[in-house]
Regions:
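Secretory targeting and sorting signals
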Residues: 1-33
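Short loop/turn segments that connect beta-strands within beta-propeller blades
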Residues: 79-84, 131-136, 172-177, 215-220, ...
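Glycine/small-residue-rich hydrophobic helix-like segments
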Residues: 209-274
Length: 308
């Protein structure tokens, strides 16, 4: 995985064994390669670059500006439009967790502090800060979480936070109460909410790789949508999104595919050849990284537009 050697050490250690096992698998033409989606669009187009960054999280504001988290510098970077330079926007305290999401009031939520993700379920060292996108001011938002690799926010302001290297999924209520053990799902990574706020969708990166959804009303009963097996066992799904039809679209760290889930254990590739893909985000607004467009960012610091 390009760029991974400088990224979060704990994650590299976990990914190392999977990557080594994958080398022989990927040497065969069909290994780890999903069928191409019949409606896949054009080939990926490079639209941005953050030189030297290892991007873990990405989100677009209403003005079409792209924000990304850099695991190497603990900074949030901003790219105002495709082709524009990535500029430092804010620095978070402690090690970068990577998750990014917008609160209902427009503030940018950023996960931090999960350098000890393997023991995060016990130590709960992670938290979330809130950034004013107008001024760049950083303020505390929540603490006491296992990790915050993925963040998702409901319409009422409830925040969900995942940990790709442990098991706890945390919840922060609108009144500020933190529930670090709201759900248990090993290696839950990324976070995306259904349009009706009934389900939290997550990738399972390192343990039983696949995609699950967790009913918000019954977090003890997660449902598996995809179980990657065979040659696909080592694809390492990461920060996913849902399309307009509610279908999960998942980037893969190792195989470099952008996969769309069309049904139970049915998936196809919208794009390939993008090793180190860590996160997807849809655009917003009428200009810049605009609404209706899908963007991929990765540990290589590159941002691509994906035909979807």
């Amino acid at each position: 995985m390009r760029g991974m050697r400088f990224a979060r050490p704990a994650r590299i250690a976990a990914a190392g064994a999977a990557l080594a096992a994958t080398v022989s698998l990927l040497s065969t033409p069909q290994a780890g390669a999903a069928p191409i989606c019949p409606d896949a669009g054009r080939a990926p187009v490079l639209v941005g670059r953050a030189p030297g960054a290892a991007i873990e999280g990405a989100a677009v504001d209403g003005a079409g500006r792209l924000y990304v988290t850099d695991l190497r510098s603990n900074r949030v970077l901003r790219i105002d439009r495709p082709g524009a330079p990535a500029v430092p926007f804010a620095t978070v305290p402690g090690p970068m967790g990577g998750g990014l999401a917008f609160a209902p009031d427009g503030g940018l939520l950023v996960g931090y502090g999960d350098a000890r993700v393997f023991v995060g379920d016990v130590a709960r060292p992670a938290g979330i800060v809130k950034i004013d996108v107008g001024t760049g001011a950083v303020a505390p938002f929540a603490s006491g979480l296992s990790a915050a690799n993925g963040l998702a926010v409901t319409r009422d302001g409830t925040v969900y936070a995942t940990n790709d290297l442990a098991s706890l999924v945390g919840r922060v209520l609108p009144n500020g109460v933190v529930q670090p053990d709201w759900a248990v799902l090993p290696s839950a990574n990324g976070a995306a909410l259904s349009a009706d706020d009934r389900y939290l969708y997550v990738s399972r990166t390192f343990v039983n790789p696949g995609v699950s959804r967790i009913p918000l009303a019954n977090p003890a009963a997660p449902e598996s949508l995809v179980d990657f097996g065979g040659a696909d066992m080592f694809v390492a799904p990461d920060g996913l999104v849902l399309d307009a039809l509610g279908r999960p679209i998942v980037p893969t760290d190792i195989s470099g595919e952008i996969l769309r889930v069309d049904g139970h254990n049915r998936y196809c590739a919208l794009a390939g050849g993008l090793q180190g893909s860590s996160v997807l985000t849809f655009g917003s607004g009428g200009s810049g990284f605009s609404a209706g467009r899908l963007f991929r960012a990765g540990f290589d610091g590159d941002i691509y537009e994906i035909g979807a």
